[in-house]
UniProtKB/Swiss-Prot annotation:
Gene: argG
Subcellular location, record wording: Cytoplasm
Organism: Methanosphaera stadtmanae (strain ATCC 43021 / DSM 3091 / JCM 11832 / MCB-3)
Keywords: Amino-acid biosynthesis, Arginine biosynthesis, ATP-binding, Cytoplasm, Ligase, Nucleotide-binding
Protein name (database record): Argininosuccinate synthase
Family under the similarity heading: Belongs to the argininosuccinate synthase family. Type 1 subfamily.
Reaction(s) catalysed (UniProt annotation): L-citrulline + L-aspartate + ATP = 2-(N(omega)-L-arginino)succinate + AMP + diphosphate + H(+)
Length: 392
């Protein structure tokens, strides 16, 4: 009997997939859950659920450190935001797929399975990475059988699959952020209720006193918060805690999915927003004007590649090479004031700063103003010629 490794969360979709793979595909099912910073119970529950449903074997893979260092920190270094969102779900998918491939190779499996539907982004993200990392077959039972939510529930009851507790919202959570969708949130005319948020306080409940956060960067990566040196996972968690407590990081947006659907999405990404904001401010102190323009274009393109699941696209690796070189100078300290949902960079310093106080001072003669006369005279020469042509 051939083996299949199923990316397993313990939710309805992947729970139904276990039985479908055994019944419809006649395969030995190995389930695997990859820990990228989910709540502890979301790591423990899949193992118990897999055993109850009848998985032949289960793996739990701790990938938090790799996710923080190689993926979340890459988001910071590139300031990558897709339509204003720091890609907490999208950055996790290629790592999860990579770990599933590693298990499949270890088990000599012929196939990898996932529980994605045919309407979402994750089918593209998972399968693009799986195909780049291996020649294994891929199946997606829920999509392949075109199952609705109700049909999945009926199938689960018929096959004795314990139904997960009914949730109003679909929630995906990892170290870098939480995404909340479904239920009444599907109507963009309906305000998101306070109950959906767990990481962030409302502006009403946030502290009355502003908090100043000091973040130190080395080569573009955050290394200290408030002078405390922290490993990547701990640093991100600290940033989430501080920013979330001050009402930072709520995003309510209508997002353009890969297949063209518009989807109402709610996110909590307090630490990501704080760290990216501080990092971008430091870059503006250090980079030249042309570097800043280029970095903005790089950020947008990088975010598109990650969102679209193109982690193994050669261009992404090319951009990493350029970005890593630029980040060698992004070393310094930034202070950010947080207060009731607002965030403002108040100080920044770096040994690589291109800012020259002497040159910009109103009191200092670092630059002889008279030398500007000739430069200003011919500034916008083409604009002047264009206006002359119009007049004639």
């Amino acid at each position: 009997m051939e083996k299949v490794v199923l990316a397993f969360s313990g939710g309805l979709d992947t729970s139904v997939c276990v039985k479908l793979l055994q019944e419809k595909y006649n395969m030995e099912v190995i389930t695997a859950c990859v820990d990228v910073g989910q709540p502890e119970d979301e790591i423990k529950k899949p193992e118990a659920a897999a055993q109850k449903i009848g998985s032949d074997k289960h793996y739990t893979i701790d990938a938090k450190d790799e996710f923080a260092k190689e993926y979340a920190f890459r988001c910071i270094k590139t300031n990558s935001l897709y339509e204003g969102y720091p890609l907490s779900t999208a950055y996790a998918r290629p790592l999860i797929a990579k770990k599933i491939v590693e298990i499949a190779k270890k088990e000599n499996a012929s196939t990898i399975a996932h529980g994605c539907t045919g309407k979402g982004n994750d089918q593209f993200r998972f399968e693009a990475t799986i195909r780049s990392e291996s020649d294994l077959d891929i199946v997606a039972p829920v999509r392949d059988y075109n199952l609705t939510r109700t049909e999945e529930q009926d199938y689960a009851r018929e096959h004795g699959i314990p139904l997960p507790s009914e949730k109003i919202y679909s929630i995906d959570e990892n170290l870098w952020g939480r995404s909340i969708e479904g239920g009444l949130l599907e109507n963009p005319a309906t305000a998101a209720p306070e109950e959906i948020y767990e990481w962030t306080k409302s502006t009403v409940d946030a502290p009355e006193t502003p908090q100043i956060v000091k973040i130190e960067f080395v080569n573009g990566e955050p290394v200290k918060i408030n002078d405390e040196e922290l490993e990547p996972v701990a640093l991100i968690r600290k940033a989430n805690e501080i920013a979330g407590n001050n009402g930072i990081g709520r995003i309510d947006m209508v997002e353009d999915r890969i297949i063209g659907l518009k989807s109402r999405e709610n996110y909590e990404t307090p630490g990501a927003i704080l760290l990216i904001t501080a990092h971008a401010a430091l870059e503006k102190l250090i980079f030249s004007r042309e570097e800043i323009k280029f970095a903005e274009n790089l950020s947008q393109k990088y975010a598109e590649l990650v969102y679209n699941g193109l982690w193994n696209e050669p261009l992404r690796e090319d951009l990493d090479v350029v970005n890593d070189h630029m980040q060698q100078r992004v070393t310094g300290t930034v202070e950010v004031r947080l207060h009731k949902g607002s965030m403002k960079v108040i100080t920044k310093e770096s040994p690589y700063a291109l800012y020259n106080e002497e040159n910009v001072s109103f009191e200092d003669k670092g630059i002889d103003q008279r030398e500007m006369i000739g430069m200003v005279k011919y500034y916008d020469l083409q604009g002047a010629e264009y206006s002359k042509v119009k007049r004639e």
